[in-house]
Each structure stands twice: as structure tokens, then as C-alpha cells.
From Swiss-Prot:
It is an enzyme of class 7 (translocase). This is A-type ATP synthase subunit A. It comes from the Archaea. It is a peripheral membrane protein. The keyword Lyase does not apply. Pfam families: ATP-synt_ab, ATP-synt_ab_N, ATP-synt_ab_Xtn, ATP-synt_VA_C. PANTHER family: H(+)-TRANSPORTING TWO-SECTOR ATPASE, V-TYPE PROTON ATPASE CATALYTIC SUBUNIT A. Keywords: ATP synthesis, ATP-binding, Cell membrane, Hydrogen ion transport, Ion transport, Membrane, Nucleotide-binding, Translocase, Transport. It comes from Methanococcus maripaludis (strain C5 / ATCC BAA-1333). CDD domains: ATP-synt_V_A-type_alpha_C, ATP-synt_V_A-type_alpha_N, V_A-ATPase_A. GO terms for cellular component: plasma membrane; proton-transporting two-sector ATPase complex, catalytic domain. NCBIfam families: ATP_syn_A_arch, PRK04192.1. Has multiple subunits with at least A(3), B(3), C, D, E, F, H, I and proteolipid K(x).
Length: 586
């Protein structure tokens, strides 16, 4: 084991000598208190270490001890419902062990409890041939998730021993006879966070991730296994949007990373999620959630670790054939941590002081998203979908973190402070946002809703763009100077904005909107548009069209349950629309 000595300390960056024999990204214990750090640079016998804990009080001359292993996470039953810090230390366990609401420096608590016994049910039998990724048994970890125990990387052969029963994560549940001899398999495995977990190959992203948010699903959909960015200035609703995604997304597991954001926002997640029901299983949302809390007052170096810890945990659940959503709030804080450490290392700064390797670091993270065919002899498919919030100072989307993120992700949900000030939520600007997955996922929508979904969606987008062009004229001469047809376009665009795009995150029905309800709502508004244009062409007054009472029914449809709306209200609204608009024709 390499033992060196501290010669320089600069904030979270420590320089140690006598480190010959160390490896890049090796975890080391720094100082007399044994603070956790990671080697990020090696020169001759000197190592530069980023320390994941507060360095106040340590001094030159104290020891640095290598562990011989890279920064790794423990993967196994017990991760769901847990809350970790950036280097996978369980916060609840630390509080119980130290009787303190603060994390003491140098504290070491196992990431996964070694005392809890899990009921392991073997699905493989003695004599079965197994390879890496094969499922040999299951554990009912929470009411929502059955945790699959897999053969770790590098083991393949014939099962010599396996039995069902209650085991801790360190006890042997199976013995595999391999070419190199007998290998024991436990329920827990370790994986280095910077190394992507392997798969057989990536699959095309053709299935949409249903989030229940109309503007995201219908207009700017993200595919399962895709990557999306939510940039927006302060107060535009990034965190509420992330919370909505974590609550309602059509996934099996959610990994929520609070990376350098306010502690109150993590508190909100912890307080809310245990009381909310998962629409897929009917169980509590917390049963399928892993929280990684790395708030703004925690050491900056741990922000990078929290992002890699989160994506590695997400890939592990993906390898079980599950769908995982990873939300990172916010990647800008991670980039700021990189900038701070780069400054301490006296590296050549890039644009706005960020390091020159900013774009490659972001790409390494987002490229770990994807829908894959999992390792193993059975046909398993899983996906990781990444949604990263970006907090550009002053809402400037041309700044380096936002512009580099846009080069990597295929979905851009641009939050607009002006919409937020007008109380339009989600404040996603339909003119600047985009999705490059629409062509890929249109087939699923047409199969699961109706064949005209794509044409309705494109026509609605065209109307919203046309409204933006007409607004300039309206501000100069007023709406009454416009031709009748264009006055109808303005009215329909207003209905699209207020009755379709706006959504109440705190309303028990409107908080989540199913794909079929989304389609029917859009169909009604676009049917109204077609019939209103027809009525105007036959001599109806646009003022009369704007005054029909069916518009009140259209405005209220978002608050109706799926059953009531689709089975009862849709035909009623269309019949009422036809009779009221028909009565206006002279």
C-alpha cells in the first residue's frame, strides 16, 4: 500500500509526495482523519488529489494512504429508498451511527447494510450453465421492485451450489465452477463509477418516455434511452419540472441527483415522495427511488462523484432489464465545480473560465444513456434516460455549459422566465424547444392513439408559430385589424396555450395526463379550429365564434378524469361544438 505525505493544500485540492506506485483515479485516505479523496493527476512521485470532504484543519506533513482501488459503488439489494451523498455514503445510517445531523469528516459507513437479511429466491438450479449478466435469483426489495441477482462480470461456468433462503449481501448465495476454479457469488457487487457498465449493444430509441406532461410528450417527446436537457434561468421551474418527471415518468426506477442545488429541494423530495402513489404499481413513489443528495454547501469535488455514482447505479438497474430515469439537478453546478478545481490546478482556462475538457466530460456522462440489450443468455432489454437541468446565469443559452450540452442531447426543453412570470407552467417555450426523436417515436404514438397524431401535432405547432408572427402585427394595430381567418388562428393558439400546454403540477387530475387523453384534447382543439375556419368562410362573425359556450367545456377538459373525459365528454363536446358553430353561419 502506497503511503505518501501532504506537501500542499489548496481548498479541495491536495498535493502529496511519495506516491510512486499509485494509479490514476485511485481512492486515497487523506490526513489524520482519513478524508476520502481521488487521485486526478500524477507527476513522478507527486499526486494531485481532489478531496470529497472539507479540508479545513489538515496540514502539510500529514499522511496520505492509497487504497489500491478506484472510486467504486456497491450495487445490490438495499439501494432503493436510500439517500446517499455524492460518494454513496448513506445519510440515514451516518445520522444513526454518529447521532449528528451533520456528516462528520472521515466517517466510513457501508453503502449497503451488512446486517439486513434479504429473502433470496433462486431461479437457477445446480448444473445450469451461466454467463455474465445471467439472473440466478430474485429478492423482493420493495413492494414495487423485484431485485434480480446477476452473475458479475468475468464469471461464467456451471453452477455448483445455489440455494434459496435469507442472506446478507456479503453471504454467498451461489458457487460457480469456472475454468479458473470455483467462484463465489454474493448479492452485492462493486463497480468503478467512471467505467460504463457493458451491454450486448444499443437499441434504436423508438418508444417514447411517457412523462404525463402534455408539452413534453406531444410536442417535444424524449425516447426511452434518450437524453434531454432542461435549461432555464432562476425561478423558471426547472426543479418542479424535474420533480414531475420523477413522479410520473413511465419507468421502473428513478435515480434523483441533487447536484449542488438547495437543500430545501431535496427535503421537498424526501417529504413528498413517501406520500405519493406510483400510477404504474399503486405503491409509494419512494419504493422505486434512489436519492443522491449533494447540496450546495457540501464540498464541490463531490459534485462530480455524485453524477458518476448516480449513472452507475442507474446502469446497474438497467442491466436487470428495467427502465431507469436519471435526473441531475443541476449539471451547471457540476461544471462550476470542475471550473473551481481546474483553477486550483492552474490549468489553462477555456471559455468563461471553464476547463477545455468541459464538453468531453459532459459527453461521457450523457452518452451513458441508452436503450440496450443486456448481458446474459436471456433476451433482456433495459434503458437509462438522462434528464439534466442546466442553470445558465441570467438565462443566457449561449454560455458554455448550455451550448455544449445542446451538442450532445437530442431534446431541448427551454424554460422561459417570461412564461414563468405569466404563471404559465410548465414554462417550456414552444418556439425555442425541440426534439430530434419525433420521427422515431411517431410510429408508437400512431399505433397507440390514432393514425392522425403526427399531422395534428405538426398542425398545432404551425399554429403556435403563426401566432408568434401575428403578435407583432397585433401589438401595432390591434387584433380587430386582422382578417377573420387570422383572428381565428389567434384564438385557437390561445386555446392551445392555455387549455393544452398549461398544466397544473399540484392538481390531482391535471398533474398527469395519459397519452390517449393528450391525443383527444388536441383532437378537440384542432377540430374546433377546422370547424371555426369553415364557419368563418361561410360568413360567421369571428367575435361570435370566440363567444360560444363550448369553449368553457374545452377549458375544463384537462381537469376531467380519463374515463369521464374520453368515454363521455369527447362526443358531447364535439356535438355541442357542431351545433353552436353551425348556428352562427348566416
Amino acid at each position: 500500500m502506497v503511503v505518501g505525505k501532504i506537501i500542499k493544500i489548496s481548498g479541495p485540492v491536495v498535493v502529496a509526495e511519495g506516491m510512486k506506485g499509485s494509479q490514476m483515479f485511485e481512492v486515497v485516505k487523506v490526513g489524520n482523519e482519513g478524508l476520502t479523496g481521488e487521485i486526478i493527476q500524477l507527476t513522478e512521485d507527486e499526486a494531485i488529489i481532489q478531496v470529497y470532504e472539507e479540508t479545513a484543519g489538515i496540514k502539510p506533513g500529514e499522511g496520505v494512504e492509497g487504497t489500491g482501488a478506484p472510486l467504486s459503488v456497491e450495487l445490490g439489494p438495499g439501494m432503493l429508498k436510500a439517500m446517499y451523498d455524492g460518494i454513496q455514503r448513506p445519510l440515514n445510517e451516518i445520522e444513526n451511527a454518529t447521532d449528528s445531523i451533520y456528516i462528520p469528516r472521515g466517517v466510513s459507513v457501508p453503502s449497503i447494510s451488512r446486517d439486513i437479511k434479504w429473502d433470496f429466491e433462486a431461479t437457477a438450479a445446480v448444473g445450469d450453465e451461466v454467463i455474465t449478466g445471467d439472473v440466478i435469483g430474485t429478492v423482493q426489495e420493495t413492494a414495487s421492485i423485484v431485485h434480480k441477482i446477476m452473475i458479475p462480470l468475468g464469471i461464467s461456468g456451471k453452477i455448483k451450489e445455489i440455494k434459496s433462503g435469507s442472506f446478507t449481501v456479503e453471504e454467498t448465495v451461489a458457487v460457480v465452477e469456472t475454468a479458473e476454479g470455483e467462484k463465489e457469488v454474493q448479492m452485492m457487487q462493486k463497480w468503478p463509477v467512471r467505467k460504463p457498465r457493458p451491454s450486448k449493444g444499443k437499441q434504436p430509441p423508438v418508444i417514447p418516455l411517457i412523462t404525463g406532461q402534455r408539452v413534453e410528450d406531444t410536442f417535444f417527446g424524449v425516447a426511452k434511452g434518450g437524453a434531454a436537457a432542461i435549461p432555464g434561468p432562476f425561478g423558471s421551474g426547472k426543479t418542479v419540472t424535474q420533480h414531475q418527471l420523477a413522479k410520473w415518468s413511465d419507468v421502473d426506477v428513478v435515480v434523483y441527483i441533487g447536484c449542488g442545488e438547495r437543500g430545501n429541494e431535496m427535503t421537498e423530495v424526501i417529504e413528498e415522495f413517501p406520500h405519493l402513489d406510483d400510477i404504474k404499481t399503486g405503491n409509494k413513489l419512494m419504493d422505486r427511488t434512489v436519492l443522491i443528495a449533494n447540496t450546495s454547501n457540501m464540498p464541490v469535488a463531490a459534485r462530480e462523484a455524485s453524477v458518476y455514482t448516480g449513472i452507475t447505479i442507474a446502469e446497474y438497474f438497467r442491466d436487470q432489464g428495467l427502465g431507469v430515469l436519471l435526473t441531475a439537478d443541476s449539471t451547471s453546478r457540476w461544471a462550476e465545480a470542475m471550473r473551481e478545481i481546474s483553477g486550483r490546478l492552474e490549468e489553462m482556462p477555456g471559455e468563461e473560465g471553464y476547463p477545455a475538457y468541459l464538453s468531453s466530460k459532459l459527453a461521457q456522462f450523457y452518452e451513458r444513456a441508452g436503450r440496450v440489450q443486456c448481458l446474459g443468455s436471456e433476451d433482456k432489454h433495459g434503458f437509462v434516460c438522462i434528464v439534466g437541468a442546466v442553470s445558465p446565469p441570467g438565462g443566457d443559452f449561449s454560455e458554455p455549459v448550455t451550448s455544449n450540452t445542446l451538442r450532445i442531447v437530442k431534446v431541448f426543453w427551454a424554460l422561459d422566465a417570461n412564461l414563468a412570470r405569466r404563471r404559465h407552467f410548465p414554462a417550456i417555450n414552444w418556439l425555442t424547444s425541440y426534439s430530434l426523436y419525433i420521427d422515431d417515436i411517431a410510429g408508437w404514438w400512431q399505433e397507440n392513439t390514432a393514425a392522425d397524431w403526427r399531422s395534428l401535432r405538426d398542425e398545432a405547432m404551425t399554429l403556435l408559430q403563426k401566432e408568434a408572427e401575428l403578435q407583432e402585427i397585433v401589438q401595432l394595430v390591434g387584433p380587430d385589424a386582422l382578417p377573420d381567418r387570422e383572428r381565428v388562428i389567434l384564438e385557437i393558439a390561445r386555446m392551445l396555450r392555455e387549455d393544452f400546454l398549461q398544466q397544473d403540477a399540484y392538481h390531482e387530475v391535471d398533474s398527469y395526463c395519459s397519452p390517449l387523453k393528450q391525443y383527444n384534447m388536441l383532437k378537440i382543439i384542432m377540430t374546433y379550429y377546422t370547424k371555426a375556419l369553415d364557419a368563418v368562410a361561410k360568413g360567421a362573425d369571428p367575435a361570435g365564434i370566440s363567444a360560444v359556450t363550448v369553449k368553457g367545456d374545452i377549458a375544463r377538459m384537462k381537469y376531467l378524469t380519463d374515463d369521464e373525459f374520453i368515454n363521455t365528454k369527447v362526443p358531447e363536446i364535439i356535438n355541442k361544438m357542431e351545433s353552436e358553430l353551425g348556428a352562427l353561419i348566416k
